[in-house]
Amino acid sequence: MKQVTGFAPASVGNVACGFDVLGFALTEPGDEVTVSFTDDENSPAQVIISKIIGDGGALPTDPYKNTASIVVIKFLEFLKTHKGIEQSGTFSIELKKNLPLSSGMGSSASSAAAALIAANSLLGSPCTKMELVPFVMEGERIACGSIHADNAAPAMLGNFILTRSYDPLDLIPISTPPELYCSLVHPHIEVPTSHARSILKKEIALSSAVRQWGNVGALVAGLLRCDYELIGRALEDVVAEPVRAPLIPGFYDVKHAALDAGALGGSIAGSGPSIFAFSDSLAKAETIAKAMQETFRKVSNLESDIWFCPVSREGSRIL
């Protein structure tokens, strides 16, 4: 039997103004997936889930309904069809969930990316990380009913990733400014991604679209120029944040607390309920995270978990 353990970090999709087209990875926390392979030339390849730790029994063990396993199934099918690599035997998956569910932290993408990087390594790395991203996106379909790359791509690749197009898929990595840090607070409530997506408007005013486009362009420019002040100005969302904010008790109070503590800017992480904020030093990031946590406690009587760390430049990796 051979086995490999993969890790993939939490990620933040949308990044305020970049709904479904922009995301970044954190250095922590992240999910761990161990993939074990037992060869059996008399048996066709099968994928099973042997153990899930840390989910409180919430995740399915059916390999076709769990993001960590379905992506490995799709990956093996791809290898057989497109690369002439066919396996026989059993791939057993053990998932250690370190990310909260329905948190806006890219939990499903983290599990999928960790499983894929482990399975790919186990088979001699026949695919590049970039080639693995579409499989992570298939995991997102299982998790929330739609394919999107704003968590899937950074969880696998690290850094900021801009999705220029979905058909064909065109991913553009953006290097992270050296002194950019993220504070993340996760209140102890759940906001299912499917619900957070369902309440969004299907059409928006042209004036809102123009403002959003301007902010996306400015954010990308700020990242490329390492212009921290511009990054902060660009963290404005006129499309999703106003609709989703009511799902998070005390959201605007927490956001203002982050700004008062020195944040460059911030918004809802993905579909929520987590909230992120950027700063230009680790010390500030810690202060901001604690301020957001305390505000949730005072304003909404909600306990929360916090993290403060750099943006991950690596994404998924083998442990």
Curated annotation (Swiss-Prot):
InterPro entries per UniProt:
GHMP_kinase_C_dom (IPR013750), GHMP_kinase_C_sf (IPR036554), GHMP_kinase_N_dom (IPR006204), GHMP_knse_ATP-bd_CS (IPR006203), Homoserine_kinase (IPR000870), Ribosomal_Su5_D2-typ_SF (IPR020568), Ribsml_uS5_D2-typ_fold_subgr (IPR014721)
**UniProtKB keywords:** Amino-acid biosynthesis, ATP-binding, Cytoplasm, Kinase, Nucleotide-binding, Threonine biosynthesis, Transferase
**Gene3D superfamilies, A to Z:** 3.30.230.10, GHMP kinase, C-terminal domain
Where ATP binds, per the record, is at 100-110
BP GO annotations = threonine biosynthetic process
Catalytic reaction list: L-homoserine + ATP = O-phospho-L-homoserine + ADP + H(+)
Enzyme Commission numbers on file: 2.7.1.39
Compartment(s) where it occurs, according to its Swiss-Prot or TrEMBL record: Cytoplasm
Q: Identify the main location.
A: cytoplasm
Q: Which GO terms describe its molecular function?
A: ATP binding; homoserine kinase activity
- Protein name per its UniProtKB record: Homoserine kinase
- Gene for this protein? thrB
